[in-house]
Design a protein with these regions (language model features):
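A cross-kingdom signal targeting lumenal/periplasmic-facing segments of multi-pass membrane
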Residues: 76-217, 224-229
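Short extracytoplasmic
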Residues: 43-74
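Alpha-helical transmembrane signal-anchor/signal-peptide segments
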Residues: 29-47
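Hydrophobic membrane-insertion alpha-helices, especially the h-region
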Residues: 9-25
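Short acidic/polar alpha-helix capping motifs at helix-coil junctions
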Residues: 2, 12-13, 36-39
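Active-site-proximal structural scaffolding
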Residues: 13-17, 43, 183, 214
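Cytosolic-side transmembrane helix boundary signature
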Residues: 1-7
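Intrinsically disordered, low-complexity segments enriched in polar/charged residues with Gly/Pro
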Residues: 9, 60-64, 121, 143
Length: 229
């Protein structure tokens, strides 16, 4: 008897969940397709001592991303000849407009060595959480030697009044806000990459020094293209 009641209760729960799901699908108000983007598709020409020049999208990105995807990119250099590559990728109409940067990197010759989340202190606003990737790829120097170039990359996603360093959180927020808040995020991701120059140039920077350099650059550049967090 207890077993029969338990089975009946489970069946009722399944039916209730199914009914609620169908009701949400049937009666949820369609989200506003014109929801604003969380970024402006522009990068500054100057960030402190850093001077930037426009750079085109990579061939891997052109192949993987739909033609309506917005991309802006600049390569920056400071007086000591350190360099930073900054990029904003803004989704178009198709869901595949955005993906994890980890998908494109192997096509550009990079190997991902580690991944974690770091905080970027910002003036007058909460710290930004970004995913950090430590990368390597073989490069040939002018003297003919082949060495392993190391690099530090920071990236994060920006939606309508929200940011996250995690791809799965972006996916969850997309579904949740679409159903509950009738909000259709037009997501973008921002990434900032710099080579780790220790051993490659005079006064080269190690991994932690490169991270600090990127933190300072982001703190100066972010207010020009992003309002949150």
């Amino acid at each position: 008897m207890d077993s029969s009641r338990s089975l009946l209760l489970r069946a009722l729960i399944v039916c209730a969940v199914f009914g609620v799901t169908m009701a949400l699908c049937r009666y949820t108000i369609p989200p506003d397709e014109a929801t604003r983007a969380g970024v402006r598709l522009v990068l500054p020409d100057q960030v402190g001592l850093w001077t930037g020049e426009d750079e085109p999208a990579s061939q891997a990105e052109k192949t993987l991303l739909p033609p309506d995807t917005g991309i802006v990119r600049k390569r920056y250099q400071d007086p000591s000849r350190q360099s930073i590559l900054a990029s904003i990728v803004l989704a178009g109409a198709e869901k595949r407009s955005l993906h994890r940067p980890e998908i494109c990197l192997p096509g550009q010759g990079w190997t991902i060595r580690s991944s974690d989340v770091v905080a970027i202190p910002l003036d007058g606003r909460p710290a930004l959480q970004a995913t950090r990737l430590l990368l390597t790829r073989p490069v040939r120097l002018t003297d003919g030697r082949e060495v392993s170039l190391r690099a530090c990359m920071l990236y994060w996603y920006v939606g309508d009044e929200v940011t996250t360093p995690k791809h799965w959180v972006r996916i969850w927020l997309t579904s949740w806000d679409r159903v509950v808040h009738h909000r259709n995020h037009r997501w973008a991701y921002v990434y900032i990459l710099a080579p780790i120059t220790e051993g490659l140039m005079p006064n080269g920077k190690n991994g932690e020094e490169t991270l600090d350099m990127l933190r300072g650059f982001i703190a100066g550049a972010l207010p020009t293209f992003q309002d949150v967090p």
